[in-house]
Amino acid sequence: MNDTFMKEKPVLPLILSMAMPMVLSMLVNSLYNIIDSFFVAQISEEAMTALSLVYPVQNFINAVGIGFGVGINAVIAFYLGAGDNKKADQAATQGLVLAMIHGVVLTVCGITMMPAFLGMFTSSKTVIELGVHYSVIAFSFTLIIVVGVTFEKIFQAVGNMKTTMISLMCGCIINIVLDPVLIFGYGPFPEMGIEGAALATGIGQTLTLAIYLVVYFVRPIRVHICRQYILLSKKMVIKLYSIGIPATLNLALPSLLISALNAILAAYSEVYILVLGIYYKLQTFIYLPANGIVQGMRPLIGYNYGAGENKRVSQIYKIVLCMSGIIMVLGLSLIHISEPTR
């Protein structure tokens, strides 16, 4: 696939062509978050509270995967823009190796620490038990999640946003379909309750990764995973983490905020924790479209910076900043319009 269009195509049409597929997939993903909460709420109030308590940990795991993926994406795009394909391959390969290490560590830590973590916010044995059951299944798919995010960022780095859109949407749609089937038990499927919600999510994430792998092998892209680059290079590792760590912290800090708020609210009522969890799920419906635009921007910034097109970098940044601001203002207006009258 020829990626020179990232420095040749007019800026606004380029941003729209890169961002709109991601905006659409992010909207579907945010819709899933709301639907998932709706079905879990049908189980019991305790199940919804458990999901709200597990949510910041899930968000932290996603932050590590996505944040480091941003580093992979930026480094690959930079080297492609500079015309150094070998370095781009090295960044992709070593980024994948490091992401897999992150996945294994997060899986072990998440599953082993969850009972103690839940006990910090509630004394209800039912809520803790439901939270542990959900998290054991959900966190078992952590390695699949981080590898999937890595391939997502690799495809985005070469400008292949359609594959990313299709993969994410297919994963979300199968998730939405399987949620009621596995939670309540339809046809040959047993009733699994909150564990069914976790399994449905895991199956959706597995499908997303499977699509990436099929496309990668059937329709090769410009960047390749190469055995010769598996051994980690100190320079490349530093470059990946120098971008990945700040991005991870930026995404992970809200998880710490939610956990702190949960600890405060737990002193009053578990219902408050439930309401806060629902609010953050609804908030993503506004935030994720803006995030989709930013995801479309990242490879463009990296590619043009690597190619020395500093003027285009500035143009891209300013246009995306305006587009994101417009979405946030519209979201704020929508919230005020929908506020119930007292």
Describe each region flagged by the PLM:
Residues M1-A19, I76-L143, F189-I245, I301-R342:
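Short alpha-helical transmembrane segments in multi-pass integral membrane proteins
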Residues P13-N73, A77, I245-L265:
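Signature of the first transmembrane helix
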